[in-house]
Amino acid sequence: MPCSTEAMEKAGHGHASTPRKRSLSNSSFRLRSESLNTLRLRRIFDLFDKNSDGIITVDELSRALNLLGLETDLSELESTVKSFTREGNIGLQFEDFISLHQSLNDSYFAYGGEDEDDNEEDMRKSILSQEEADSFGGFKVFDEDGDGYISARELQMVLGKLGFSEGSEIDRVEKMIVSVDSNRDGRVDFFEFKDMMRSVLVRSS
């Protein structure tokens, strides 16, 4: 498949300058990595899912790969996505995305020999706008355990430290999470965090 998934987190939401195109045959990126656990795959999936509807379409995947500077054949990409797409769907759900990753040959994926956490940070920086990069810095402050999500307790603790009235009661914090929790998992990812903070700042202004 014409893409790179360890580098996949470079794509998704945000904007970046057009990178130099590289052919996959000469690429140092690989698409298969035993070290990519479900949590990291979820982050990649969420970055690719530009409209946050829980499905990665061919267009979203193509856009992500283009931001990575990877040349893709649209017909081949469509064929690959279709082979993992459930009947009646228009793209890949997260479980389909995991199946795609598991099916790939070990000769693909990841930066060889480099620190994966550093790679992940570099990828995000390369695709996020300055506003989003600033927001991500704030997100990391809230995400105290570094799992890529903000729990109600984490949110309450930081809001309290910042002096927001929302941090005074856990019930209010939980309502804030529910209001932006588009995938209903009871916690806040980066893109949900941006929406939540916008609403907090509007109410506080």
Swiss-Prot record:
This is Calcium-binding allergen Bet v 3. Residues 36-71, 72-107, 130-165, 168-203 form the EF-hand domain. SUPFAM superfamilies: EF-hand. Ca(2+) 2 binds at D143, D145, D147, Y149, E154. Ca(2+) 1 binds at D49, N51, D53, E60. Keywords: Allergen, Calcium, Metal-binding, Repeat. Gene3D superfamilies: EF-hand (1.10.238.10). InterPro entries: Centrin_CML-like (IPR050145), EF-hand-dom_pair (IPR011992), EF_Hand_1_Ca_BS (IPR018247), EF_hand_dom (IPR002048). It comes from the Eukaryota. Residues 1-26 are annotated as: Disordered. PANTHER family: CALCIUM BINDING PROTEIN (PTHR23050). The gene is BETVIII. It comes from Betula pendula (European white birch). Ca(2+) 3 binds at D181, N183, D185, R187, E192.
